[in-house]
Structures are given as C-alpha cells and as structure tokens.
C-alpha cells in the first residue's frame, strides 16, 4: 500500500511524468477543460458529483506530492476577490504568490501553453475556482 495521500493511479502516473516548469491545471466544474487545454494535455476527470471533489481537496493532495514554483488564478475582473483565493493561500502556505490573470488571459494560457502536462476536472461549484500550478524543483 502507498503511504502517500494521492491514491489515484492515473494521477500518480501523470505527476511522475511532470518535470520542472511543467504546469498542472486544477479546475472547477464550470471550466471548459476540453476546449481550453491543448490536445497534448493529459486530462483527468475526477468529478463524482456536484461539489465532490473540490479544487481545494485536490490541491491539498497535490501540494504534498510536488514542489510548486508558481501559482496562477483566474480573476473575475473588477470587484471582490473570490473567497477561495484565501483558501489557496492557506493551502500553499504563502510559499508562492497567487498571480492573477483575467478570465480570457487564463483561458489563453491554458490553451496555448505546450507545457501544461495535466488538467484535473473537479466537481467544484464555486466560480473562479481554477488554479494553474508550475512544478518546481525538488
């Protein structure tokens, strides 16, 4: 039996193939994962039902499996910061700043970037609950 938190074989395999500078997208249930990622991006569909798992559930497991060098989030534009951003900061222990990208800039980054190795779809219902992680060195 594995002694790590991540037990999903497809996810473990994908993480093992990530290298420095590769990116991992964890997206909410509203994110157009098929049309806003490249054909070379491995996609894992973890959503079981509405709200399960959440983006933060997945982030908590990943953060113990990889080093994160950079984190980017999708902002709704002007107005209040989404509450989930505070949760993101708490989970990553403020080790890296959350770089904010506008909605369409985030989509473009996800679609055009050839180094997005993995995209994980969740059942998250909160809006703007998407985070793009850049894998750091060990």
Question: What are these language model-derived features?
Answer:
Residues 1-48:
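Long, hydrophobic N-terminal alpha-helical segment
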Residues 30-35, 40-42, 63, 88-90, ...:
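Short, solvent-exposed amphipathic alpha-helical segments in soluble enzyme
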Residues 36, 40-70:
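A phosphate-binding glycine/aspartate-rich beta-alpha loop in the early core of alpha/beta enzymes
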Residues 2, 6-10, 19, 50-57, ...:
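Conserved active-site and cofactor/substrate-binding residues in soluble primary-metabolism enzymes
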Residues 80-138:
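Glycine-rich, aromatic-bearing surface loops/beta-hairpins
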Residues 22-25, 42-44, 69-78, 96-99, ...:
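Structural motif
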